[in-house]
Structures are given as C-alpha cells and as structure tokens.
C-alpha cells in the first residue's frame, strides 16, 4: 500500500476485510404463434448468498441471502403500416439481511436482522406507425411497486416494520424521418421513474429499518440526432438533455468506512452530445470510435456543482482485424477528470488506457484449440479506479492495476 492507502490497509487487515458470493440461476424462454400475434414469454430465478466483512465493528459483518424471480409475457404483431406490442411483467426480490459486530474478523452480536421484500407489477404497450419516409412510435408503461420490511430483532422490543406502495406512468414518443436511403434524423422524448433498490433502502444511517427519507428519482428528457449508413462508413450524431428530480447519490459516514449510504440530491441536469462512427477498412479490418462531451450538474438547497463520479468527456477508439483463424483487437480509451465529491473539492485525474487482445484458432486432428493473449493497460498507465463518491476520510479511489497479462487456452474434442 502507498502512503494514501496505508491506514486503510491496516484497517482491512485488522478486520479481515473480505467477501464471498455463491449464486445459482436458471430460466426458461417460450415462444409461440397465435391468431392475435407472436407470443413471447420468459421466467427466471436466482439465489445469491453473500458474506462480507467490512473494516468497522458495528454491523461490519454482513450476511445476505437474496431470492430474485420474475416472469414476463408479451404479444406482438404487425400489418402493412402498424407494429404493436403489449405485455405484462412481475418481479419479486426477497432479501434476508443480517448484520453483526465485526470483532477483528470474528462474528459478534447481531445488530440487524430483517426480511426485505420488493415486488413489482408492470404493464406496457408500444405502437409504431411506419411509412416509407417516416416512422412514429409511442409507448406507455405502468409500474406498481410494493415494498415491505419485517424487523426480526426489535431494539427494546420496538420492531420497525414497514410497508409502502409506489406507482408511476412512464410515457415515451419518437419520430424517425428518412432523408434518403442512407440518412435519417430522429427525435425522442420520454419520462422515467426509478425507485430505490432494497440495498439502498436498507442502508439506513439511523440503524434498523428502511431509510424512509430516500425518495424515488423522476426523470424526463429528449434526444435528437442524425444517422448515416453507407457501404463502408456509418456514423451517428446525437444531442441529449435529461432533467432529474431527487437524484440518488451514495456517501459514507465516519465509523462505517466501506459501507454505502444513499440520499436524494435535489435536481440534476445532463446536457451533451455523442458521436459514434464505424469504418470498414477492407482487409486491414474495422475501425470503431465514440466520443461524448457533456455537462452533468446538480442544484440542492441553493448549492450547485458538478455531479460526482461522471467525467465530462470520454473517447474510445477500437481496431478489429481478422485473417483466417487469427483475430486481433486493440482499443484506446481516454477518460476526462471527474469530481469525487458533491462539494467538487476532490478531482480524480484523467487517464489514457490501452488494451490489446490476440487469439488464434487451430483445427488439429481430433480436437480444436484456441490460444489467446490479452494485455491490459498496455502503456502501463498510472490511474485511479474503484471511485467511491462522497467517501469518508479521503478514501475516494484506489490505484488501478498496472500492465497485466492474461493467457487463455480453450479446447474442444
């Protein structure tokens, strides 16, 4: 550890900071045709068992067992000018969350024991009217969320149970106009609604129970752009504007280093432009590039500044090359500086990252062999990663990995 990280490394060793995860998941997808149209359905289930040791005593030993399941069914059809799809979905998440004292790596007394449930019901419809030169799309989604908490510990026999229902409509509308066979312009408008997750709600700075001061986010915005596609070149240019109320942001508290808490941050605005392009070089391969330039700002109780954790600009360049059984991928990524805190006092420097990956396939008698080499951070750039916005004790980031090599071998008989 360097000087900046030495104190935290000592705490990590003292409290035996670590985590382990066991997970299973399964799912099924069914499709069939009816007189009304094509029906698509899916169902899924996963279970996640998590144990984490954080570098503090009170609640620093975490056990979480999560059941997550859901299903969706929709039907779609199209005629000469119309396309439509309607559907419904359900999701259910149940978290058995326990926290104990972390007595220097050993499980101590229980500090939190609660069952958290989040059930969502959704219904949606999307219709598109298509003509030769233009297309109009419109959609509407309705969501109903039921959130509950059962406290199993009860401090001084005071059990903190919780139940709440939230609902929202999310409309959207868009227009695409074809200038000619290869060029088109478009404009979209939409509204969205995002409830806090169970993990965000359960991170209550006041102790057990949910953080009832945490509200859902509401966003509205539009984007307008131009797309072109020719034989060798395709590109798109877009401008966007998003207005969000009650932005959810993370922060940390003294004595709970490494644990995330969440709060609402007034209003925020995202205004910017994006450029994406792809060029077919022929035998030399394909070049892909993307660039984003934007402003991400917030205002909260008369205080304004830049949103933490988001760079104002970034650029990516990628080269793909293939010849017979050989494949090569090189990429270059530039990320501008960003603020690590809402006060805009700590700035994380910009960096330039490069990677290269090569692989070759061999068809040998009786079996197939693929050998690959991936070099990450090819130029050995020193930069910071794992950004923790609004962290306590200046623990905003960690040094990222320097140049590393990954050798892979895959075979099939």
Ranges and model annotations:
Residues 78-81, 129-132, 145, 239-243, ...:
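Gram-negative outer-membrane beta-barrel transporters
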Residues 193, 243-245, 287, 337-339, ...:
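C-terminal beta-signal and adjacent terminal beta-strands/loops
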Residues 26-32, 71-77, 123-129, 140, ...:
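Residues on the lipid-exposed face of transmembrane beta-strands in outer-membrane beta-barrel proteins
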Residues 19-154, 228, 233-241, 286-288:
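Face-selective signature of the C-terminal outer-membrane beta-barrel domain
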Residues 1-10:
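Single conserved hydrophobic/aromatic residue that forms the stacking wall/gate
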Residues 39-43, 84-88, 136-140, 171, ...:
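Transmembrane beta-strands of outer-membrane beta-barrel proteins
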Residues 64-76, 118-124, 211-215, 221, ...:
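Outer membrane beta-barrel strand-and-loop segments of large Gram-negative receptors
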Residues 92-103, 146-155, 176-223, 234-235, ...:
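Surface-exposed extracellular loop regions of Gram-negative outer-membrane beta-barrel proteins
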């Amino acid at each position: 550890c360097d000087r900046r990280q030495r104190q935290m490394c000592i705490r990590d060793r003292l409290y035996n900071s670590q985590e382990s995860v066991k997970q299973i998941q399964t799912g099924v997808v069914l499709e069939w045709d009816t007189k009304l149209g094509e029906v698509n359905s899916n169902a899924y289930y996963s279970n996640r068992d998590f144990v984490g040791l954080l570098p503090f005593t009170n609640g620093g030993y975490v056990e979480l067992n999560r059941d997550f399941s859901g299903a969706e069914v929709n039907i779609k059809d199209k005629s000469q000018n119309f396309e439509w799809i309607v559907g419904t979905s359900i999701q259910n998440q149940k978290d058995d969350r326990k926290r104990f004292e972390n007595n220097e790596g050993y499980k101590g007394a229980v500090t939190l024991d609660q069952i958290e449930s989040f059930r969502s019901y959704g219904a949606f419809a999307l219709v598109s009217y298509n003509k030769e030169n233009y297309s109009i799309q419109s959609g509407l989604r309705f969501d109903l969320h039921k959130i509950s908490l059962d406290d199993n510990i009860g401090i001084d026999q005071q059990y903190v149970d919780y139940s709440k229902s939230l609902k929202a409509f999310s409309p959207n509308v868009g227009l695409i106009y074809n200038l000619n066979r290869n060029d088109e312009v478009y404009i979209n408008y939409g509204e969205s609604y995002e409830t806090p997750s169970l993990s965000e709600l359960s991170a209550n700075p006041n102790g057990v129970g949910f953080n009832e001061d945490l509200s859902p986010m509401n966003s509205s915005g539009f984007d307008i752009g131009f797309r072109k596609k020719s034989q060798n070149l395709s590109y798109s240019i877009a401008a966007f504007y998003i207005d969000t109320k009650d932005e959810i942001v993370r922060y940390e508290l003294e004595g709970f280093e490494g644990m995330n808490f969440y709060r609402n941050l007034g209003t925020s605005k995202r205004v910017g432009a994006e450029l994406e392009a792809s060029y077919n070089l022929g035998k030399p391969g394909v070049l892909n590039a993307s660039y984003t330039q934007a402003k991400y700002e917030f205002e909260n109780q008369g205080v304004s500044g830049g949103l933490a954790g988001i760079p104002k600009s970034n650029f990516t360049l990628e080269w793909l090359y293939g010849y017979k059984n050989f494949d090569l991928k090189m990429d270059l990524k530039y990320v501008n500086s960003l603020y690590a805190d809402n006060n805009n006092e700590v700035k994380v420097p910009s960096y330039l990252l490069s990677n290269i990956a090569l692989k070759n396939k061999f068809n040998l008698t009786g079996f197939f062999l693929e050998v690959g080499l991936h070099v990450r951070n090819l130029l050995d750039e020193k930069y910071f990663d794992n950004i923790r916005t609004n962290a306590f004790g200046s623990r905003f980031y960690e040094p990222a990995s320097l140049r590393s090599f990954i050798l892979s071998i895959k075979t099939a008989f």
